[in-house]
Amino acid sequence: MQDSIEQYMQKVGQQARDASRVLTSASTSLKNHALSAIYTALENNQAAILAANQIDMEKGRSNQLDSALLDRLELTPARFKGMLQGLKDVIALVDPIGEITDLAYRPTGIQIGKMRVPLGVVGMIYESRPNVTLEAASLAIKSGNAIILRGGSEALESNKAIAEAVKHGLKVAGLPEHSVQVIETSDRAAVGHLITMAEYVDVIVPRGGKSLIERVTNEARIPVIKHLDGNCHVFVEAQADLQKALPITLNAKTHRYGVCNAMETLLVDEKIAEVFLPHIAELYAEKQVELRGCPETRRILGTTVKPATEEDWYTEYLGPILAVKVVSGIDEAIDHINKYGSHHTDAIVTENYTLARQFLARVDSSSVVVNASTRFADGFEYGLGAEIGISTDKIHARGPVGLEGLTSQKWIVLGDGQIRQ
């Protein structure tokens, strides 16, 4: 069986590499034509795709997947409509491929500049969310990359149904059908082959929990753009406008639980904790959010608040649970975030401009927010159209990874017969 999986993955890799050589020089109009044809195919096959998703949902329930995973897995008509809108947004994006920047003459008379080019073949490993299949496929096509998608086994039927529509659209436009491939096996050995096929794959994008990220980081022979978990914080500073702080901290936690940009720890300055905490605790109680607090939080709110452990400060709950800590000021808040956070998205609520700038400079996260919800950390909200993930790395791409994150630059040299003396 291992041999057959290896042969299957080698074939997928070769097909992706061949497709990437065509895509790299495909015109913007041709790529947009393919994306428009995919849009039509998805519209025409909505019922079949939603039916496939229901098969996955039923399996998920029978396998006792937790509520956060089931929420990520489910494709409702409204979410399907959102997927289609996201595809429209990608079509409308400016194509970065071929863009020449920093063109300048050198004393020798040659011109030096940089041209934006595709990465080549992207391998993506992710869990649960079928909408990621379409987002990743559309961004790859628009940026001239082939992509190999390995979704979670819990979403296999949904991903296969979406991939069929994508394949149809590519065929209509005359682009290689293997520009986008979904791995159609749940065998974990496929991941091992994908992350070591350096001759076929140029970059790996893992999007999932710590165990997945650790495995890919340890075993990959290919550059990795990591999408790690989102242990996000909001710090309500002493000079915060509480009329802003209340809706921000409520939205950051309760707008949607099972997403990586939801707040998991609330930090409150000790100077306003006595006033702020009872108000926000009342709002959380209405949403049935369980609070786990430090000793000072429990003194203010009462012992019905569970005591927070060291593990709680590190935890991405992806559910209606929130860790709460009262801090002495901005220094303790920043130290806490940089120690326990996942470098994803962290926010401050304050009316003090100097402290806001200090927070922006010192918090080591891919997105740092002032006076707004962490839920804005999203490719669509950032104007990227869609995202392939949110990178917590510092090299190549950081934060929401859109079209530009799937490209690199090469130097170009323009001469008129010059030779080096």
Curated annotation (Swiss-Prot):
Gene3D superfamilies tied to this protein: Aldehyde Dehydrogenase, Chain A, domain 1 (3.40.605.10), Aldehyde Dehydrogenase, Chain A, domain 2 (3.40.309.10)
A biological process from GO: L-proline biosynthetic process
Compartment(s) where it occurs, according to its Swiss-Prot or TrEMBL record: Cytoplasm
Reaction(s) this enzyme catalyzes, per UniProt: L-glutamate 5-semialdehyde + phosphate + NADP(+) = L-glutamyl 5-phosphate + NADPH + H(+)
Main location per the UniProt record: cytoplasm
Pfam families in the record: Aldedh
GO MF annotation list: glutamate-5-semialdehyde dehydrogenase activity; NADP binding
PROSITE patterns: PROA
SUPFAM superfamilies in alphabetical order: ALDH-like
InterPro entries in alphabetical order: Ald_DH/histidinol_DH (IPR016161), Ald_DH_C (IPR016163), Ald_DH_N (IPR016162), Aldehyde_DH_dom (IPR015590), G-glutamylP_reductase_CS (IPR020593), Glu-5-SA_DH (IPR012134), GPR_dom (IPR000965)
Pathways involved: Amino-acid biosynthesis; L-proline biosynthesis; L-glutamate 5-semialdehyde from L-glutamate: step 2/2
Domain of life from the UniProt record: Bacteria
Alphabetically ordered keywords of this record: Amino-acid biosynthesis, Cytoplasm, NADP, Oxidoreductase, Proline biosynthesis
GO (cellular component) term, any one: cytoplasm
Tagged with keyword Cytoplasm: yes
The EC number(s) this enzyme carries: 1.2.1.41
UniProt function note: Catalyzes the NADPH-dependent reduction of L-glutamate 5-phosphate into L-glutamate 5-semialdehyde and phosphate. The product spontaneously undergoes cyclization to form 1-pyrroline-5-carboxylate.
HAMAP family: ProA (MF_00412)
Family named by the database record: Belongs to the gamma-glutamyl phosphate reductase family.
Name recorded for this polypeptide: Gamma-glutamyl phosphate reductase
Organism, scientific name: Acinetobacter baumannii (strain ACICU)
Lineage: Bacteria, Pseudomonadati, Pseudomonadota, Gammaproteobacteria, Moraxellales
Gene (UniProt): proA
